[in-house]
Amino acid sequence: MALFTIHADCRYEIVRKIAEGGMGIVYEAEQHGAHGFVKRVAIKVIRQQYARQPEFIANFIGEAKLVADLIHTNIVQTYHLGEAHGVYFIAMELIRGVNLEQFTQQHVQRARRLPRELAVFIVSRVARGLAYAHAKTDRDGRPLGIVHRDVSFKNILIAFEGDVKLTDFGIAKARGYLTDQEGEVIAGKADFMSPEQASFQKTDKRSDLFSAGVVLAHLLLGYNIFKAATPEESRQRVLQLPIPDFRTLDERIDDRLNAILHKALARDLHKRYASADELLYDLEHYIYHAGYGPTNETLGRYIRELFDGSGATAGPSPLMEKSTGLMLRAEHLSRPH
């Protein structure tokens, strides 16, 4: 039984749109509290056309409940699940930075190659977040069996301070939180999904490790070996493309890194990494075995220099003009006149 209950008016003022997808929109917002308290957050809102679909709403709520208990430096934190006039929204940690898609595009625009050690470091931070999520249990100590199922460039963020964050557990599966049509529909981005996903099979945590391997190969090579003209063609490449000797594609990839990539991208589950902890160990040993290696500060300096003076608008800016006036309250949605 609770000691007592606090009833508080929680108000969010939308500042600008950050990102837009097929099912939802993410905004930068100001959370207002008592005595002039203001905190910048990200607000994820369901599109109107999905707001009345019970299964979609159930998954959206399930995502919020699931991620609320995932408190880790490499996972975007969820603060609040709200509903206003039938529109559900999630208030999340605001990351001032870019996703990996924007990060790699900036390298192309500036004719730069991402240093090998930083590529490995980024994926090692993703592996840290996955290791935590995969091991998460409920209050009774029972494993939740979390599988992200969409480890991809758009769902990995790098803050300008150098923190790497995994986000969007919207199609994750976990016992008791989200409805699951696994085996009936394909979830995830075709060129980042595992062979199990691509062939409509059940997945476990090893599926996320294959996707992490795709991310690492993409960061190193500058392109995704599975990406084709259409999602279906990409899916077929995930299932059939021979995994290359990466040493022949990039002279910076040595024997040890090639072995890590092949183990992560093994189609045979028994030959793939068994856990994110195993992948993390190999990645960290690779970059730190000689002593000093990359840190968040190293990555932060690199990304700030990469985007400095480029005119890029990849990340939320605190100087952006307030462009909408949309106000979200706990049980109220209005647009001021």
Task: Please annotate each region the language model reported.
Residues 157, 191-334:
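C-terminal lobe helix-coil module of Hanks-type protein kinase domains
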Residues 1-244:
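Conserved ATP-binding/catalytic core of the eukaryotic-like protein kinase fold
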